[in-house]
Amino acid sequence: MSIFQKKMFKKLSNFFIEQRPIYKEYKLPHEILYKRILIKSYDNWFYQKLKISKDINGRFEIIVLHIFIIFHCLSNNDKKNLTFKQSFLETFIDELESTYREIGISDNTFSKKMKIAAKSIYRRLDVYSQTIENIDLFNESLQRNIWPLEDQDTNKVNELNEYVYKKIKKYKNKSFDEIIESSKQGF
């Protein structure tokens, strides 16, 4: 087999193998927790069982929902938590910016896309915060954000809702250090 054939075979093999995402090395506490959430966002349960779209939009929704869980659990707004939340969100926005650049969004539309994304993030965090105490309203907000073009499927919404409430129960009233420690085996 020639060198050219070997290279082509390798490229074709890689094309058909589902690649696991390559994560950069995260060392700071907010980066470590972000990486765990990012890894969780690739869990096929969201895409196969709940039928969330397996694309950049679906992954965005899953990551934002996990950010909400973290922020809700870190409701004590002392300076340490506020700094952590800000750094955590900045990491996500930096990653989102990098993703947009990788998929080729032009410089002409880049700032507009980032403004829209930032508004979407803050709007979702706000809506989830306002509705989390009322299960019906929370389900409506999940339906509207995660499955916007589908008729309501209460099974999917209820399963995701249960997932969110379980995570909140697991991490509620813990410091971010405790959340990082208890999520070592996966968020």
How should each PLM-predicted stretch be described?
Residues 2-65, 69-187:
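Surface/interface-facing alpha-helical segments and adjacent flexible terminal/loop regions used
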